[in-house]
Amino acid sequence: MFTINAEVRKEQGKGASRRLRAANKFPAIIYGGKEAPLAIELDHDKVMNMQAKAEFYSEVLAIVVDGKEIKVKAQDVQRHPYKPKLQHIDFVRA
C-alpha cells in the first residue's frame, strides 16, 4: 500500500495552484463518502515516482492529512500536455 503525506490547502484558485506547482507541489482533492470534499496539496516528485507503478491506480492508497489517515483510490489524474508533470489528482474515499 502506498502512503502519501499531504497538507490541507490554505488557498484555492488558478493563482494558488500555479504557486504550488512552482514550489514543486500540486493540488489534489479527496471526495466521496459522507464527509465534505477536502482540498489538499501533494509533493510532486514523491507522487510522480509512485504513480509510475500500475498499483497506484488499482490499489487503495493511504493519504495522511494532519496526522489522520484517509483510505482513497485514484479517480482521475490530469497531466501537463507535454512536460512529464502532474497537474491535479482526484481521489475518492474507499
Swiss-Prot record:
One BP term from GO: translation
Keyword tRNA processing: no
Keywords attached to this entry: Ribonucleoprotein, Ribosomal protein, RNA-binding, rRNA-binding
Record-linked Pfam families: Ribosomal_L25p
Segment forming the signal sequence: none
GO terms for cellular component: cytosolic large ribosomal subunit
Entry keyword annotation includes rRNA-binding: yes
GO MF annotation terms: 5S rRNA binding; structural constituent of ribosome
Family the entry assigns: Belongs to the bacterial ribosomal protein bL25 family.
PANTHER family: RIBOSOMAL PROTEIN L25/GLN-TRNA SYNTHETASE, ANTI-CODON-BINDING DOMAIN-CONTAINING PROTEIN (PTHR33284), RIBOSOMAL PROTEIN L25_GLN-TRNA SYNTHETASE, ANTI-CODON-BINDING DOMAIN-CONTAINING PROTEIN (PTHR33284:SF1)
Oligomer and partners: Part of the 50S ribosomal subunit; part of the 5S rRNA/L5/L18/L25 subcomplex. Contacts the 5S rRNA. Binds to the 5S rRNA independently of L5 and L18.
Protein's job: This is one of the proteins that binds to the 5S RNA in the ribosome where it forms part of the central protuberance.
NCBIfam families: PRK05943.1 (NF004612)
Official protein name in the record: Large ribosomal subunit protein bL25
Species assigned in the record: Shigella boydii serotype 4 (strain Sb227)
Gene: rplY
